[in-house]
């Protein structure tokens, strides 16, 4: 699912860990937020207004959601973050009790929980985004094995680091087998274009590089299962979930409604995402998964076993690579009740829609 199709963001992950943040939450901290619902979201202002990427834009326009909040006298407060520093800003905002929810990726969320600030997945992110390994257009390199000892641009601490680790481990390789150059996607693309690196591991911007004849994709996750995709979810502060379950349910309902609408309006949704800078052809090809279809990609089903296994892998990677100092349990990151109830709440509305009522 493309909750965050613009997750190529800078994240000073190692700096956060090095600070040794071990902040244990005070359950009373969130009480000041009783009349507010504060959500961090990737925002883009290039279109003239403030637009949110993906699902949050639909939530912000959902009349059912907005009416319910108004009736309960709850102020909806969006906390825009730029694509330059999403994970850093989101984690800092959670730590400083400035937000209650955020749409963002798996590895930063694990790092946050290791500091003692507890969050849980309220609504899972469907199938996730594809990841790609791209080399210069005229490179003779054909496989990840051919890159052993060579320079690979990879933005460390970002969610797709997990996918890169998964790829090399599947070939019996380790990070130390490569010269990893820590570059954000913009710098990584420039480095590949200048041939100052031998490869670049990234998201759908690899398709743009290929279209411009600056690179060629030698591996992608498009034909692989959801376990190979980059994940982003709707995360909520645990103390808020415990203290305000009704408000949390309203947000979960709105998120599931948005996902349902997207699953039924592929062309319209994809066209709407072009305002954030990617060509329509790139957006369309990014979604061409061969192991699932569009409707399945946007399913909000809360697959506990799958998520537990996935986040156990993320935690293991974070521990082994010293990205976190305190191991956490994958099951503590999960909270399926809100999504499951949201799916039940959606069904009567879906029936009415089909009947034309």
Predicted regions, residues:
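Short helix-initiation/N-cap motifs at beta->coil->alpha
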Residues: 77-92, 105, 178-193
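Secondary-structure end/capping motifs
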Residues: 45-47, 244-325
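Short, polar/charged alpha-helical segment
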Residues: 43-77, 115, 167, 310-313
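Flexible hinge/capping segments at coil-to-helix
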Residues: 136-151, 242-246
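C-terminal motif of bacterial Sec signal peptides marking the signal peptidase cleavage site
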Residues: 15-18
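Pocket-lining segment of extracytoplasmic ligand-binding domains
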Residues: 181, 186-277
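A ligand-binding cleft/hinge motif common to bilobed small-molecule-binding domains
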Residues: 103-115, 165-166, 197-217, 310
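Conserved C-terminal helix/tail region of periplasmic/extracytoplasmic solute-binding proteins
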Residues: 315-357
